């Protein structure tokens, strides 16, 4: 007598509600992150717009983990990939509009594009964004800053959606900004922000942006596979910089597999071509160990690390 085949449990994507955006399985994240390493997303969701995102969040299985990513500029995805859902905001969240001295930006808008739009509109104060890789959503999440300014200095209000699909309007005080951090709950998703500029001649703004670009190219490995600043400065804007401590500990040029501490700026890790995420993370941890042994100061990761480590063969 023939035995009936045992029914297979539904895959994750089969358990998810219908969307107007795009749901995809087994999406390679190594093609997204600037390090060009890492395993796949089990399922990636690219919502069409805020309504699509909110509807999805209200209906999704609550036990399924959700991870939000941007353009992958300050991100290390581990080699075993990311289980559950990976949410990536796309074109529906990248619009930038100006009205008087205010700029409304979607969370997926590139920081550099926001700075460029402000310049064309004759607004100053946002030039620093031209030197920050990534999106406005990520900039708000970590209070990104460069060249003497931070996102908190120009934020009027932010829009976010909580895990239940409820929209919220948040003031800078609500976000409780600190050095490279915000008080935004980890499971809330930034969807847009209103930023403030000041009237200025576009040529003046252009000169400032050019100076920032030149300074960045002179001091950072901008043409390498890197994730930006690896560690936060231990005392914020005060005290020794992370790169100074790394240099003091003799880590400039240190290698682990295909990963290397940049010779140009030693708070940057580089994928020299064949690095794994494990190489990069292991090298970062070795840098932390050597800095602590040399200086007594503990460095904390600024690069966000997500996913699981690759399982070793048995």
Predicted features and spans:
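Anion-binding (especially nucleotide phosphate/pyrophosphate-binding) glycine-rich loop
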Residues: 4-136, 144-146
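Short beta-strand-to-turn element immediately C-terminal to the catalytic PLP-Schiff-base lysine
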Residues: 46-47, 76-79, 87-88, 141-143, ...
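Beta-strand secondary-structure signal
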Residues: 44, 104, 157-159, 192-194
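Phosphate/pyrophosphate- and phosphate-bearing ligand-binding catalytic cores of soluble enzymes
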Residues: 24-25, 161-285, 289-314
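Acidic/polar active-site rim loop that often engages polyanionic ligands
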Residues: 97-100, 139-140, 188-192
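Glycine-rich, mobile lid/loop segments that gate access to catalytic sites or pores
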Residues: 110, 141, 146-169, 177-181
């Amino acid at each position: 007598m023939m035995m009936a085949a045992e029914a297979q449990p539904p895959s994750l994507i089969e358990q998810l509600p219908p969307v107007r955006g795009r749901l995809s399985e087994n999406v390679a994240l190594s093609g997204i992150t600037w390090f060009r390493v890492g395993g796949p997303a089990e399922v990636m969701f690219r919502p069409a717009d805020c309504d699509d995102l909110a509807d999805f969040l209200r209906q999704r299985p609550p036990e399924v983990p959700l991870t939000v990513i941007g353009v992958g500029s300050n991100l290390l995805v581990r080699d075993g990939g990311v289980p559950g859902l990976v949410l990536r905001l796309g074109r529906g969240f990248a619009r930038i509009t100006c009205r008087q001295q205010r700029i409304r930006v979607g969370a997926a808008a590139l920081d550099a594009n926001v700075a460029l739009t402000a310049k064309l509109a004759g607004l100053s104060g946002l030039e620093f964004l031209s030197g920050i890789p990534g999106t406005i959503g990520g900039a708000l999440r970590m209070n990104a800053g460069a060249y003497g300014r931070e996102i908190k200095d120009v934020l009027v209000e932010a829009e976010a959606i909580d895990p239940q699909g409820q929209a919220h309007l948040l003031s800078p005080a609500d976000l409780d900004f600190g050095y490279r951090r915000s008080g935004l709950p980890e499971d809330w998703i930034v969807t847009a922000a209103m930023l403030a500029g000041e009237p200025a001649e576009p040529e003046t703004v252009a000169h400032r942006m050019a100076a920032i670009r030149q300074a960045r190219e002179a001091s950072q490995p901008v043409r390498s596979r890197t994730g930006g600043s690896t560690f936060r400065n231990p005392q914020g804007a005060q005290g020794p910089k992370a790169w100074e401590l790394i240099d003091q500990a003799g880590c400039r040029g240190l290698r682990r597999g295909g990963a290397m501490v940049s010779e140009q700026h030693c708070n940057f890790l580089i994928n020299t071509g064949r690095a794994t995420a494990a190489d990069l993370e292991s090298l970062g941890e070795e840098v932390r160990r050597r800095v602590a042994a040399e200086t007594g100061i503990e460095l904390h990761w600024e690069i966000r690390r997500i996913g699981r480590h690759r399982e070793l063969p048995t």
